[in-house]
């Protein structure tokens, strides 16, 4: 069929048109790490976490941190944000590696370590190949150690939803790697959990080795939730407007947020 003979397009409500509500949907993605001025109500937590990880910026050992808080309180967001800034702030040629593991997906020791090795490895630089499957846990650890020493002075690892991991010994092995002579680079672990009692159920040997500092994230209040919404207002542009209600808002406190339609 030639272009001249092709049928004209017909608007069908079943499919999206070229006009969409959101100009930049990346701002709404769960894994998106926004700029510092978009993170609301977490200045104190950012500062406290940065203090614990400060050693990595100078090539020393970062501290291990256990972060607690309910779902949706910014634990993962702040952790990723601070790690990103630590990488950018690294001084005097210090190389910092960071990796994020979702323990809801990689919930076995082997899965977590193989994912870490794959994420932290730059094969073109190290010459190391990390297969997704097929190796024993101990071999994946060896690949991870080789990968880290080949590239980094310090590494910060985020283990999100650590309470879903079926073997907490991964905390001990990662946090003791340098002390045990497995690697020369320093490793710090940020473990995140919704369950404040998680550490109470951790093996005593693991707990003793991990030697973590604790950080608790309180739920956002109504004002912070409202500010979060408006801090992402520019995910839209200035055409058609839509209004949504936000629970707990009143007319006197800007009870309606406007989202404007835009074309990509």
From Swiss-Prot:
InterPro entries referenced in this protein's UniProt entry, alphabetically: AAA+_ATPase, AAA_22, ORC1/CDC6, Orc1/Cdc6_arc, P-loop_NTPase
Alphabetical UniProt keywords: ATP-binding, DNA replication, Nucleotide-binding, Plasmid
User: Where does the chain bind ATP?
Assistant: 73-77, 220, 232
In terms of Pfam families, this protein maps to: AAA_22
Q: Name one GO molecular function term.
A: ATP binding
What disulfide bonds does the UniProt entry report for this chain?
none
Highest taxon, organism lineage = Archaea
Q: Look up keyword ATP-binding and say if it applies.
A: yes
| One biological process term in Gene Ontology | DNA replication
Question: Null phenotype?
Answer: Essential for normal growth.
* Gene3D superfamilies documented for this protein: P-loop containing nucleotide triphosphate hydrolases (3.40.50.300)
According to its UniProt entry, what is the function of this protein? Involved in regulation of DNA replication.
Family stated for the protein in its record:
Belongs to the CDC6/cdc18 family.
Against NCBIfam families, the record matches this protein to: orc1/cdc6 family replication initiation protein
Record-given protein name: ORC1-type DNA replication protein 2
Which species?
Answer: Halobacterium salinarum (strain ATCC 700922 / JCM 11081 / NRC-1)
Write the gene name. orc2
């Amino acid at each position: 069929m030639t272009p001249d003979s092709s049928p004209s397009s017909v608007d069908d409500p079943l499919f999206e048109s070229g006009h969409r509500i959101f100009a930049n949907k990346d701002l709404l993605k769960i894994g998106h790490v926004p700029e510092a001025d978009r993170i609301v109500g977490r200045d104190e937590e950012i500062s406290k976490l940065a203090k614990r990880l400060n050693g990595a910026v100078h090539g020393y050992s970062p501290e291990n941190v256990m972060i607690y808080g309910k779902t949706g309180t910014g634990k993962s967001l702040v952790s990723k944000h601070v790690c990103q800034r630590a990488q950018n702030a690294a001084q005097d040629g210090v190389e910092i590696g960071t990796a994020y593991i979702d323990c809801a997906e990689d919930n076995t020791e082997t899965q977590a370590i193989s994912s870490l090795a794959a994420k932290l490895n730059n094969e073109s630089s190290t010459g190391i190949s990390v297969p997704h499957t097929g190796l024993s846990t101990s071999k994946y650890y060896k690949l991870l150690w080789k990968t880290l020493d080949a590239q980094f002075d310090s590494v910060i690892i985020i283990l999100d939803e650590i309470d879903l991991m079926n073997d907490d010994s991964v905390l001990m092995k990662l946090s003791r790697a340098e002390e045990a002579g497995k690697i020369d680079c320093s490793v710090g672990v940020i473990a995140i959990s919704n369950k404040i009692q998680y550490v109470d159920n951790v093996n005593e040997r693991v707990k003793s080795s991990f030697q973590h500092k604790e950080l608790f994230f309180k739920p956002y209040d109504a004002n912070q939730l409202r500010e979060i919404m408006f801090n992402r207002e520019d995910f839209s542009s200035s055409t058609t407007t839509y209004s949504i209600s936000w629970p707990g808002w009143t007319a006197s406190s800007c009870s309606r947020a406007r989202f404007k339609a835009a074309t990509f």
